[in-house]
Amino acid sequence: MNDNVHFILLAVFLCALCILGTRFLKNYKFKQLLNCIKNQDVSRFSQIANSRLTKLLFPPYNIEYLKLNAFLLEGDEQEIDHQFTKMLDFNLGKTQRCDLLLKAYDYYLSKRNKKQCKSILKDIKSLEEKELYQDALKCYLIIFEKCTKYVDEMESQLHSMDSKEKSYLEYLLSIQYENLGDSNKSNFYKEQSLIHSS
């Protein structure tokens, strides 16, 4: 064989080695990051996430998304707020933006932060996903505006839903019945929601 063939074979071998090595490193680092999140080892997570190698292997949004999940597990409200603000400024595709907005909306709903929810609701509306916006608006109205007009609609939907969806609807029903002053039905749906969430 001549030298050109040897050179080409060597180049192909080195390229394959680089590709496989990069994949291995990516998987290894990703598993390390996930283990830190599972074990709530935020300091180790930060150390790995902020390393040069991790920054070379992963797009910035992916690293920031993992950081957000770590802060959510830790319950550090200040860092969570900062992370959502930072990430919502990223130039994201529609799917990623939608996912992030819903995650932020659910978080701020759970914290009963009306101001943040109202702001995020406007962003959700700008996505032009009518059904998604209507669902988010419904939650906002029930939780913050003490709306009770969805009781019949939600109760009729319960029969056709899986456990996770049932749990969420039952939670919203418990709030509506609480708003109506019916503590028996509110407690019933609260208990049902807990049963279907596990």
What are these model-predicted stretches?
Residues 43-52, 76-89, 113-128, 149-162, ...:
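Alpha-helical repeat scaffolds
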Residues 21-31, 56-65, 93-102, 128-138, ...:
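Generic helix N-cap/helix-start motif at coil->alpha-helix transitions
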Residues 89-115:
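Alpha-helical transmembrane segments and their immediate juxtamembrane interface regions
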Residues 1-32:
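N-terminal signal-anchor transmembrane alpha helix of single-pass membrane proteins
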Residues 170-198:
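Alpha-helical oligomerization segments
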Residues 22-96, 120:
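N-terminal topogenic membrane-targeting module
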Residues 133-159, 164-178:
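Soluble C-terminal extramembrane regulatory/interaction domains of multi-pass membrane proteins
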Residues 36, 71, 108, 142-145, ...:
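Residue at a conserved register position within TPR or TPR-like alpha-solenoid repeats
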